[in-house]
């Protein structure tokens, strides 16, 4: 089977990719033209929740881009990824006349009114990683093609369990736009191309380490014939790996998903996990900052075909529905995981 995720090949290719890694979604609605304007020297980043290593990496990328641009970047946000937990932070940024917001949405609709108010006040809105409904933002910076992510997750688990048996999904929040899209596409991919793999359960750890750990235990207790788990969330896959590594299921139940090399290195090396994947979240924040600045500066409007330069990442083009795609993720395994540090 083939995977849309790229596996690192030559040492030269790895070094080149690492260089980028260490350097670091439509169109505008009627609210975008509100009078009053914002401060184009300010970008406010609102992740799903604070204390999440994935978003810490995105924050670092955004700060790096802001330094290169000569603008300011700050991160604020909730401690829990509930549907409306970001609203107060959006409202505060609007009152402070931020030039742009970069938001990873916990819910596609719950923050819509707050984002409308921000855009009416002249603030540009970039969603990143997890989108809102398109009418609430100017552009969405997507980590990768959703269908490709879903297919690759299924391919990875199928490879590890011999393309047959029971699997489950450990997701983040039940309302997370990106997670739900991936899960829907994974279900379609399984039905179309993997008739001997049965998805028996989908559970939600809410991007909380302990909850995800407990949900992993619950899956294994509820489904004694489980052969594998897909966790398309960095918090979830790390918590599941921690549980498996000290349990009787180590080496018997496969685990894959989306994780960072630094979180997952020990579990690759001790044999708990064979392979997993991710794009570089630092690059994602880096690209989102450049997109936000291009909008706030008037260089782009968020229309299909608009182009802008994103520092070391090069030129990007806005696609249909205002989507900007970072690129294809990498598969991490024992042979290459030490070549990455994020």
Annotate the PLM regions:
Residues 1-23:
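Sec-dependent bacterial lipoprotein signal peptides
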Residues 103-119, 186, 205-267:
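Hydrophobic alpha-helical
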């Amino acid at each position: 089977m083939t995977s849309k995720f790229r596996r690192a090949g030559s040492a030269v290719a790895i070094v080149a990719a690492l260089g980028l890694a260490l350097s670091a979604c439509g169109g505008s609605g009627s609210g975008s033209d509100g009078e009053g304007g914002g401060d184009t020297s300010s970008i406010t980043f609102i992740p799903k929740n604070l204390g999440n290593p994935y978003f810490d990496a995105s924050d670092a990328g955004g700060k790096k881009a802001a330094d290169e641009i000569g603008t300011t970047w700050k991160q604020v946000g909730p401690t829990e990824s509930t549907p409306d937990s970001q609203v107060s932070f959006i409202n505060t940024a609007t009152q402070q006349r931020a030039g742009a917001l970069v938001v990873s949405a916990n819910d596609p609709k719950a923050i819509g009114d707050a984002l409308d108010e921000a855009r009416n006040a002249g603030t540009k809105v970039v969603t990143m990683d997890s989108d809102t409904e398109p009418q609430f933002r100017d552009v969405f910076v997507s980590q990768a093609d959703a269908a490709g992510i879903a297919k690759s997750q299924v391919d990875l688990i199928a490879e590890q369990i011999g393309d047959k048996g029971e699997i489950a999904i450990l997701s983040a929040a039940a309302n997370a736009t990106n997670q739900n899209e991936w899960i829907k596409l994974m279900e379609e991919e399984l039905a179309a191309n993997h008739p001997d793999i049965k998805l028996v359960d989908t559970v939600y750890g809410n991007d909380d380490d302990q909850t995800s750990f407990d949900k992993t235990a619950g899956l294994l207790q509820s489904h004694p014939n489980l052969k594998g788990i897909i966790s398309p969330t960095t918090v979830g896959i790390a918590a599941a790996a921690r549980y498996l590594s000290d349990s009787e299921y180590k080496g018997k139940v496969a685990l894959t998903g989306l994780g960072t090399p630094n979180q997952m290195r020990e579990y690759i090396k001790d044999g708990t996990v064979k392979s997993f994947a991710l794009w570089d979240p630092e690059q994602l924040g880096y690209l989102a900052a450049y997109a936000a600045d291009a909008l706030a500066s008037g260089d782009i409007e968020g229309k299909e075909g608009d182009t802008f330069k994103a520092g070391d990442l090069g030129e990007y083009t806005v696609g249909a529905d205002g989507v900007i795609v970072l690129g294809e993720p990498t598969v991490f395994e024992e042979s290459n995981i030490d070549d990455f540090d994020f």
